[in-house]
Design a protein with these regions (language model features):
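Phosphate/diphosphate ligand-binding glycine-rich loop within oxidoreductases
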Residues: 1-81
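Glycine-rich adenosine-cofactor-binding loop
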Residues: 65-68, 78, 87-109
Length: 109
């Protein structure tokens, strides 16, 4: 049975929390998407390229696998909306983590 809980973790406690046995998988939000990259034993191709993790899984051997599903979520949204971006321009406002992900997704289309 899966249970979802909110963990509000102060930055000073992040490493200890990640090493704890209080979780098997996490959805990571701002401000920790970049900070958890260095804690991962393995990264998906997207997480490696973006240096941003929003999904963490603890493997049976205790190592952490990091992925970035934001990229695929944005790509899915564009593709399923019926918008053909070919030959079009896009304006990405902002310079935070989401803008890096959106820019990478747009470059794939």
């Amino acid at each position: 049975m899966l249970r979802c809980r909110l963990f509000e973790v102060p930055k000073a406690d992040l490493d200890a929390f990640l090493c704890s046995d209080r979780w098997d998988g996490l959805n990571v939000t701002i401000p920790y998407k970049k900070a958890v990259v260095s804690c991962c034993g393995e990264l998906s191709e997207a997480a490696e390229r973006l240096q941003s993790v929003n999904t963490l899984v603890r493997r049976p051997d205790g190592t952490l696998y990091g992925d970035n599903t934001d990229l695929f979520g944005f790509l899915y949204m564009v593709r399923s909306s019926g918008i053909d971006p070919a030959g079009k321009k896009a304006l990405v406002l902002g310079s935070g983590g989401a803008s890096v992900t959106v820019k990478a997704a747009l470059e794939q289309l």
